[in-house]
């Protein structure tokens, strides 16, 4: 494995911490008036999303992770694994439930996703920012029923449940923001 000195560490760099890949979100070089210089590093574990802050000496080294973000097309799910294909090389990989990271509720087929590969296997899947999905079940909106905040739950074709405005009906196609899980607009 490759290592990098603390002078080479930058935001966005992917490192290994206890054999788990992490991405550096913030670095701060500190040179006190007395004593040895050090670097304060904040990083986020890719699999769990947990953020940790660590102080390292200027002479310390970090292990660089073999992590690659690749654009891949979602093909299908066989119930246990979700299958993705690289559109350029036609190489296929399969992600388990832990590797999907909750993205499975937004994918219906043939969406382009960013798949994070660690040592050749997927550890995180980022769905497109917006997806268009059909509403399979929702209560009809009753005129004048705005006392509950003006929204109602709707089940989408992938099984995800989002809050939609009262005017949206069953069998309509809506646009959903996958980052927040919120309704964005109706698709004409």
Curated annotation (Swiss-Prot):
Post-translational modification comment from the UniProt entry: May be beta-lysylated on the epsilon-amino group of Lys-34 by the combined action of EpmA and EpmB, and then hydroxylated on the C5 position of the same residue by EpmC (if this protein is present). Lysylation is critical for the stimulatory effect of EF-P on peptide-bond formation. The lysylation moiety may extend toward the peptidyltransferase center and stabilize the terminal 3-CCA end of the tRNA. Hydroxylation of the C5 position on Lys-34 may allow additional potential stabilizing hydrogen-bond interactions with the P-tRNA.
Pathway assignment: Protein biosynthesis; polypeptide chain elongation
Organism for this UniProt entry: Stenotrophomonas maltophilia (strain R551-3)
Classification via InterPro entries: Elong-fact-P_C (IPR015365), NA-bd_OB-fold (IPR012340), Rib_uL2_dom2 (IPR014722), Transl_elong_fac_P/YeiP (IPR020599), Transl_elong_KOW-like (IPR013185), Transl_elong_P/YeiP_cen (IPR001059), Transl_elong_P/YeiP_CS (IPR013852), Transl_elongation_fac_P (IPR011768)
Principal location listed in the UniProt entry: cytoplasm
GO biological process, one term: peptide biosynthetic process
Cellular compartments annotated: Cytoplasm
Superkingdom as given in the UniProt entry: Bacteria
Gene that specifies this protein: efp
Name the UniProt record assigns to this protein: Elongation factor P
Family: Belongs to the elongation factor P family.
GO cellular-component term (any): cytoplasm
